[in-house]
Regions:
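A mid-sequence, solvent-exposed acidic-amphipathic segment
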Residues: 103-133
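Active-site-proximal alpha-helix that buttresses catalytic centers in soluble enzyme cores
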Residues: 1-45, 109-110
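Short aromatic-enriched loop/helix-cap "lid" or pocket-rim segments at secondary-structure transitions
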Residues: 29-30, 53-59, 147-148
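Domain-level recognition of soluble alpha/beta enzyme cores
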Residues: 153-177
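Active-site catalytic microenvironments for nucleophilic, acid-base chemistry
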Residues: 6-9, 31, 35, 122, ...
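Short, active-site-adjacent cap segments at secondary-structure transitions
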Residues: 24-26, 50-51, 141-143
Length: 178
């Protein structure tokens, strides 16, 4: 509610609003929009969903333990050391986005990032000049969009994933030529 109040106080008006289909994304988006005058309807697009970190950890942890004894040490400490858990997420994410990762049964980086970029470019293409569009999503999706805008290679995306906080605001300004 505070984010919506802040945006209302700032005079923000959105011409369009999107979110993934995760309940936290939909609920955040709707609660913000409920605080604004003349808010658009929230468009739900699952391509804005978060990275499936839990699934990746479950599938990739045994593979990474077998490849690197230091990773096994992180896993042993993850329930008592939050830094170890963050390093596990980082290692898993960076393996997932690498060209080495060819694991069936989970969403590939190419499929995930392709969906995010497609949804993001669709939102940009629909935006009219001088308007603001809201996308209520999660850290991995924001990092993927920022990586796309900055034309980063996939191994650089995690640098923008970890520092994103829940309910943070990332503003991307663009025009039709850039």
């Amino acid at each position: 509610d505070l984010t919506g109040e802040f945006l209302r106080h700032m005079g923000t008006r959105f011409s369009a609003a999107y979110s993934g289909d995760l309940s936290r994304q939909r609920e955040t988006g709707q609660r913000v929009l409920d605080q604004l005058e003349d808010a658009p309807d929230l468009v739900i697009d699952p391509r804005f969903n978060e990275v499936q970190t839990d699934e990746q950890i479950d599938v990739m942890m045994p593979i990474l333990i077998g490849r690197d004894p230091r990773f096994a040490d992180l896993v042993a400490a993850m329930n008592t050391d939050t830094k170890s858990f963050q390093k596990i997420i980082e290692t898993v994410f960076n393996y997932w986005v690498s060209h080495e990762c060819d694991i069936g049964g989970i969403q590939s980086w190419a499929d995930y990032s392709g969906g995010v970029v497609s949804a993001f470019e669709g939102a940009m293409a629909s935006a009219k000049s001088g308007t603001d569009t809201a996308i209520f999503t999660s850290g991995g999706t924001i990092a993927t969009m920022v990586g796309h805008v900055l034309r980063l290679t996939s191994d650089r995306v995690y640098e923008f994933y970890e520092p994103v906080f829940n309910c943070s605001i990332t503003r991307i300004i663009f025009n039709s030529r850039k």
